[in-house]
């Protein structure tokens, strides 16, 4: 076998017993969950090497941020991880608020936590349904998307959009939630734990599903740390780390929850960790509903935060502020900041550099899927080709995060 640009190519001679085969998986393949191309070097059905080839979904979104006012970047963040959009909004807003020295009101912080956990549930439901379908359990896919539809309707009620929500703002929220919103959230989480039990009954005790995952895709704690893996895959490798608890933001220090951890380090552990994470998210949402404070949802910073429509109609000063923010943006003090959060797929981070103008000089997005994909070969080397589908599903990557 010869090497060409770091990739193996087949020689003309065929039939040698030690000859490995090189095949493509993707970029059009249902199990890659996006336009991911994997060049696989295999010996029979045993995986020898994996060469991920990314870039098919490249959008240049980081460069686009440099041409936008700070507030205009928020809709772009939705489109990076389109399965967990509110976490993207939250991370970016927190980063810019750090640069501005701005603190969102307490009520806005609690609503942010509530919606971030709903967004986490949305992400985990998509993962569980598609992962189970990859293994052959179609029923679970239909059930999880049933509950996901309920969450999307909640997003639509509060933000007007089902997926690309763009609801968080620098300094607070776009608008007050509808009057019945919290009641609708309460009605959802009242029955959702039973749905999690239903998923568990269908999968956890299923010998076929268990055998496809148990002992497959081993990723040790040392390898996970060395490769920069975060989120559920890291905790399933025995590393007890969660930014919500260990480096709290947006008021998470006021909430009581457990961080699910497993030391089994395999696909089965990653499945169980995410299943338990959904239960903990329900507890956080319930605490947010029970302790929701009163007060404003926007910081008192008229030159940064857009005024309410009522004020615009009655106060000339509010109308002027609105006009200047929309047409000129607002200057952010020169400096740089990194803000990380615990999103559904792992640690999401925004590194924002300001040169003192109304547009960011640089926005770098650190998303977990790029690091997690690096661990794929470590988890699959020496395993059967059929195990690759189970491993890809267990790490839950999003190609929008990888390519950007």
Model-derived features with residue positions:
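Metal/cofactor-centered catalytic core regions of large enzymes
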Residues: 1-404
